[in-house]
Amino acid sequence: MIYVGAPLPATRRFDPRSGGRILGGMSEFVSTAALTDARKTFERLRAAMRETIKGKDEVVEMVLICLAAGGHLLVEDLPGVGKTTLAYSLARSMDCAFSRIQFTSDLLPSDVTGVSIYDDAAKAFVFKRGPIFANIVLADEINRATPKTQSALLEVMDRARVTVDGVPHAVGSPFLVFATQNPVDYEGTFPLPESQMDRFLMRLHIGYPQVGDEMEILRSARIGYDAIQMRAVATSAEILAAQALVSQVYIEESVLEYLLKIVTATRTESEFRAGISVRGGLALRQAAQARALLLGRDFVLPDDIQELVGPVFGHRLGLARGSFDPREERPAVVSALKRIVGAIAIPN
């Protein structure tokens, strides 16, 4: 994986406004100054998070891509591998509002979104905001809550607002739901429905650290986020400015066709219950644009698509066969995706 700050290869591409004239370097879509500012913002975030998250540079990179794309993130892994610490490291490196919701079986939807309470003095109902009203929301162990409570996140993840008693209430910007969950075969968990899974831009897995990285963690005795001393290195305004640039990152027609071929191939793949939705295809486009921006480019390459197919599509696909071990489904889906991508010609 290439990281911001690495030298970029010279790339030639077509500008659709030039009648097919081949251009090199940066385009007019994103100004050089704005691109540089966005790159520097995420360089600072990356450096800050790596101080805490040892040996997981690719995971950190995907988290930042998700943030830049304005999406939501689901991290699924065993207890104790750093899911919550990853969320705290992101939140503490930004100057923004943060809240944590511990999902349990007795959590109610109103505990998440808020509730209208009658105010005797005002002689009217007043809306008391829930913890969902923050910029970074850690939905910890989301699959321990009932499906009814999980569904409380559907509207806010899609529309950045919650509706209580028929009245819509907008959440702040930027807004990112960072959800964690234990594997579905753990006792006391409720699998997220497909409609909920589709709201997440990516699903990531952290895994155990390498021996050297784990030894460094043991030496530093950083157990839990309370011991982490971090300072904010980016403001909400800087994040919003970078997010606004993502949609301006250029995607050549041939790269869009390449993306669409991958999407279409998942719909005819016999191993999958159903293929990727239109929302899924748009999610991959948005993530690819964000990755290009973080790497200092204002145009998308096929490599951006290839690197993100797994994190963006993996949780949106399920195996067609009736019975299977849940622990085997993810690698089987990833294997099928790799086969699909490998069979599609890369545009020149």
Task: State where each predicted segment sits.
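Conserved beta-strand position immediately N-terminal to the Walker
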Residues: L73, V137, F175
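C-terminal engagement/docking regions of AAA+ P-loop ATPases
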Residues: S27-F29, T268-N348
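Pre-Walker A (pre-P-loop) alpha-helix and adjacent loop at the N terminus of AAA/AAA+ ATPase modules
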Residues: T36-L73, L78
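Walker B catalytic acidic pair
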Residues: D140-E141, A152
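Conserved alpha-helical scaffold flanking the Walker A/P-loop in AAA+ ATPase domains
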Residues: M62-L64, Y118-L138
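Short, positively charged and aromatic/hydrophobic N-terminal segments
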Residues: Y3, R13-P16, R21-I22
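Walker A/P-loop
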Residues: A68-T104
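Canonical AAA+ ATPase core
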Residues: D119-A124, A145, T149, M157-Q248, ...
